[in-house]
Amino acid sequence: MSALRFAQEGAPLMQLLYGKDAVAVAASEFHTVPLDGPYRVIPWGWDAVVKQQLLKQGAADSALPSDAEIGTLRNLQHRTSVLSLQDGAEAIDAIPALHDYLGRYHRIVLKAPWSGSGRGVRWVTDCFSQQDLYWAEKVIKEQRCVIAEPRRNVVMDFAMEYVANVSDVQFVGYSFFKTQSGVYRYNMLWNDDRIQQEIVSHLTDVSLWNALQERLNRWLQQQVLGKYQGPLGVDFFIDADGKVYLGEVNFRHTMGLVAHEYLRQHPAAEGTVFSPSSLG
């Protein structure tokens, strides 16, 4: 069976993950690929827009997830699905409640429930601007609520990378990355042992980290297994007080997964910086 895999963006990243036997192209170029037998389509991440693009480009409906599967994934991608793992975070569906939340924490982050990679985020200190309130009202109307989180003084970002299949959710490894104002910048190519040591060195209570991992594992088994198949990355951060928090879950390929695989293939790159441009 031949295996066709393509990336919505960044075909070289997918080529690294899936090897030379895979054809990695942008979505708009799918129609240029010769299809000589059964194939699989694996984008950077699934959503209804990607599926429609593929159908227009000639992909077989049988090679794509069903509309029901896309709908289930969209529900998982709503930030409320992971609130039980996020201390202090709340789903707020009314402006007065948003004012109450800001009164409690003073420095907060607002996030649109269907957003990721630093998009759909607003930073607020002490009072809302008119633009903040307009944005929040619009998000609540369109996405049911807005997610509010206390703003932490972040000293370290890292992620745990997984692949979900039919029977289980497998842990692939850790990734260590840098952000600026919540937006990804680059990964450091460190092995899992080095990243674990770095995590522990920043924590004031390792038992709380162990407990959070146990809660995450239960959540993956109860909420993800059987509902989603594919890669996913769980982002964490540690604040200046040495406490660890879960930031978000990305149901797609991630740069952390790519960096982890790159280091596996190029162990001599240990300790260097990795970003999409690293692949040329």
Q: Across the structure, where does each feature detected by a protein language model lie?
A:
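A short catalytic or substrate-binding loop motif that flags glycine-/basic-rich loops and adjacent residues
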Residues: 115, 151-156, 225-230
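Phosphate-binding site of ATP-dependent enzymes
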Residues: 106, 131-186, 233, 237-245
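A long amphipathic alpha-helix within ATP-dependent nucleotide-binding catalytic cores
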Residues: 184-241
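Well-ordered, non-membrane alpha-helical segments in soluble/globular domains
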Residues: 3-14, 76-80, 129-134, 204-218
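C-terminal active-site "lid" helix and adjoining low-complexity regulatory extension at the edge
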Residues: 200-211, 228, 240-243, 251-280
